[in-house]
Amino acid sequence: MIERFNSQFAHPEGWVGRFVGTILALKNRERNAWTISILNIQPDDQVLEIGFGPGQAIQEVAKLTPNGFVAGIDLSDVMVAQASKRNAAAIRSGHVLLQQGAESPLPFEDNKFNKVFAVNSMQFWSNPIAGLQEVRRVLKPGGRVVITIQPMWAKTEEEVQIVAEKLVFQLKQVGFKQVRLETRQIKPITTVSGMGIK
């Protein structure tokens, strides 16, 4: 039962998935706000979120991009439904587009977005390197990616550091430049955010 519940965070389904969406909306608020601040979003930016969950960050980014466009992709039909309800007006106006799908391949053309981000979803990607390659493909030259992970499985700060170093390595491996890492103390354990430029 516990394994089934935990698996819902990777791919929320059914009534348990709807409950998980409520939890994610509460738990990810601070991580979302921090990630969005690192992105330095401009009013005309084209922004993509991978693994948008209940759609809170999509909603916030839409407010920051009155002359731009916001897209999101998530594996879970339950999360797509919740996020679509939360962002209904922006979807109707064409400002926001939400789709069900995986991080690889991304259903967008090359050089589409100025900013791409993921909050607590990369750890569930089936192939992180392929996913990051896709992120780089859809980013415009000079575009920015921010990947935020709070490794809840880590028992020590040393384990968090391993996650951070791996994230930096992966960003560099697929060709991102000016890769840097930021950390933030968000209970119960340190959150890491890796940023790179195409």
Predicted ranges, named:
Residues 129-141:
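A short glycine-rich, Lys/Arg-flanked "PGG" loop and its adjoining helix->strand segment in the class I
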Residues 142-150:
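Conserved beta-strand signature within the Rossmann-like core of class I S-adenosyl-L-methionine
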Residues 46-105:
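Class I SAM-dependent methyltransferase SAM/SAH-binding core
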Residues 115-127:
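A short SAM/SAH-binding and catalytic strip from SAM-dependent methyltransferases
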Residues 104-115:
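A short acidic, Gly/Pro-enriched loop at the edge of an enzyme's catalytic core
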Residues 26-45:
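Conserved alpha-helix/loop element of class I SAM-dependent methyltransferases that forms part
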Residues 185-198:
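Core SAM-dependent methyltransferase catalytic element
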Residues 1-16:
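N-terminal, positively charged/glycine-rich alpha-helical extensions of SAM-dependent methyltransferases
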